[in-house]
Regions:
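ATP/NTP phosphate-donor binding region
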Residues: 1-74
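Accessory alpha-helical/coil subdomains and C-terminal extensions
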Residues: 2, 7-11, 17, 32-41, ...
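Buried hydrophobic positions in well-ordered alpha/beta secondary-structure cores of metabolic enzymes
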Residues: 10-11, 84, 133, 151
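Gly/Ser/Thr-rich loops at beta-strand to alpha-helix junctions
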Residues: 11-13, 88-93, 152-154
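Short glycine/serine/threonine-rich phosphate/pyrophosphate-binding segments
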Residues: 15-16, 91-96, 126-130
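Short acidic/histidine-rich motifs immediately flanking catalytic phosphotransfer sites
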Residues: 78-82
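Short Gly/Thr/Asp-enriched flexible loops that form oxyanion-binding sites at enzyme active sites
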Residues: 86-108
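Internal gly/pro-rich beta-alpha loop/helix module
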Residues: 112-182
Length: 191
């Protein structure tokens, strides 16, 4: 069975309702994940989660956090078969691109994902993005930094955000998707 490390940086996927709107709360997202039975299904990889401190809105993500994420991957590289980075959507494409150059020569997947709607909401896109990212990170088809969102696996340094309110928020206009997730996950061998 494959082992995947989830690095939770903050962002919409893990936010909860507060008096002042949505906000990330330390420890809350782990409890929410523990209540999703599909994350423990037989076909899922085993996973552990590290929560960054502080949790950030991705508009506050800087080079310092990119270095921290890259160092976490390096520090845990031998213990895991793949990595999922949960990240806010505002700067996810920038982080994916930066990490793709910082982590060159990978033999394992590093998949960035998040959501447009928090997991605490009934219509959240986060559940599918998380589950599919874990499946891809636990597979052997991808060996690079990628961004998975809305059914598409995109090369990390070719993704761009094009919608702030649609559930298909990222595109790769100048490079084909690496995989498409529908009923099955279809990897694009020619990409």
């Amino acid at each position: 069975m494959k082992n995947v490390l989830i690095i939770y940086t903050g962002g919409t996927i893990g936010m909860t309702r507060t008096e002042n709107g949505y906000a990330p709360q330390s420890g809350q997202f782990r409890r929410a994940m523990e209540a999703i039975p599909d994350l423990y299904a037989e076909q899922m990889p085993r996973w552990d989660m590290l929560e960054m401190d502080p949790l950030l809105d991705s508009s506050n993500m800087t080079v310092h956090e990119w270095n921290k994420i890259a160092q976490l991957v390096a520090d845990h590289y031998d213990a895991y078969d793949g990595f999922v980075v949960l990240h806010g959507t505002d700067t996810m494409a920038y982080t994916a691109s930066a990490l793709s150059f910082m982590l060159e020569g990978l033999a394992k997947p590093v998949i960035l994902t998040g959501s447009q709607i928090p997991m605490c909401e009934i219509r959240s896109d986060g559940r599918d993005n998380l589950i599919t990212s874990l499946l891809i990170a636990g597979a052997e088809e991808v060996h690079e930094v990628c961004l998975y969102f809305g059914g598409k696996l995109l090369r990390g340094n070719r993704a761009t955000k094009f919608s702030a309110d649609g559930l298909i928020a990222f595109l790769s206009p100048n490079y084909p998707s690496l995989a498409d997730a529908g009923i099955t996950i279809r990897y694009n061998e020619s990409a």
